[in-house]
């Protein structure tokens, strides 16, 4: 078999991510050294990120019957690697004083990132399942990494049990699709469905049931209503850096799969897309209303995440109607990645594994501006962006989602987005106001002078700067959005 340089370049990012996990494993076996393992992970993930550049210039390459490397997979792989690198930088500060083994954290994270990249490249249901499991299994260990804390162990058990249930739905849905179509290749499934006689209602019904079960499986990963019940407890119990990963990388990978799946497979029945619309509607409304009631920052951001992916479902429903919807998804996910990394990054920088819990209760942030003004400014920018305030990237993202809803006459969903944004504005501004309240006897400063020079501090500040700069001048990001478009099936 001859060496194929095109295939090698196309798969180099995935190979480097997998090799990073192997290198970390060998380093742990040879000698436990937290600093060394951290640098191996950072170098490996950065190498994988930069290796995406030559892969993006190539035409779509079908590497195996399971994986395809195109501009779409390259774009979402870049988001996955950026989110993984952000988690690593936050984890280093959090793990410095961790009383138990620290190196395995980077091994589990590298394995989960490998699974997420497999999902971004998958165009076969078997590859999707492999990617989901390769990402999910390490996350069980990461969620329960602070195993001496009861909340962390409880969160890990809940996530494991409910994730196994979601996997069962996903597998059963894949089995029903295969039984009706006779293939697991996404493109073949789309072609076969388009040729099915509409008169064969039994075939269409079973296909809808199969696709519905796939949506249930992915709905759990995206914490959509009514599959969101795990989110507040797991977000609250998991270590702060792991919560960052759960909220960003794992959800971006799943949504990339959903978009490819429903763009390739034609609409089989209007009822199915009405069902997706219903999921979007209740996720937006209930997610925002539940966030309104929270006094814990992690739980608030967890329910807020449910609402944000409800907004994204609006664009997903219209994905076959025009390129604007795909651009809206890509832009909104970039915004969501930067703002979530920044907001959870602040929680991570405020937390310590020696504490009984992370610094996630809102009273812990009362008057934070008078103690840590720069950190508070970064957090304020993140929440203003999540609320969709002008001059931030969040405003551009919300504008694109509303434009999709209006252009394709999704009026009831557009109304839900407007209502959800209004409710979100209230609870985001409530958190911001708490940051600036001053109480008598409060110390003027309690932060070290060099916190912003640490890797985690630098990452939070960089995210805040990008959110503002891209909110004022989004053209560089808009120029990249065509990369995130799928080819017409």
Swiss-Prot record:
Q: How does it sit in the membrane?
A: Multi-pass membrane protein
Q: What class of enzyme is it?
A: translocase
The record's catalysed reaction(s) read: a quinone + NADH + 5 H(+)(in) = a quinol + NAD(+) + 4 H(+)(out)
Q: Does the keyword Cell cycle apply?
A: no
Keyword Cell inner membrane among record annotations:
yes
Q: Which GO terms describe its biological process?
A: ATP synthesis coupled electron transport
Q: How is this protein annotated for GO cellular component?
A: plasma membrane
User: What InterPro entries does the record tag this protein with?
Assistant: NADH-Q_OxRdtase_suN/2, ND/Mrp_TM
Cite the EC number: 7.1.1.-
Q: Which UniProt keywords apply?
A: Cell inner membrane, Cell membrane, Membrane, NAD, Quinone, Translocase, Transmembrane, Transmembrane helix, Transport, Ubiquinone
MF annotations from Gene Ontology: NADH dehydrogenase (ubiquinone) activity; NADH:ubiquinone reductase (non-electrogenic) activity; quinone binding
Q: Transmembrane region positions?
A: 6-26, 37-57, 66-86, 105-125, 127-147, 159-179, 204-224, 239-259, 271-291, 299-319, 329-349, 377-397, 408-430, 452-472
> Record's HAMAP family?
NDH1_NuoN_1
Per the record, the similarity remark reads:
Belongs to the complex I subunit 2 family.
NCBIfam families (UniProt xref): NDH_I_N, PRK05777.1-1
Name the UniProt record assigns to this protein? NADH-quinone oxidoreductase subunit N
Give the species this sequence originates from: Tolumonas auensis (strain DSM 9187 / NBRC 110442 / TA 4)
Gene name tied to this protein: nuoN
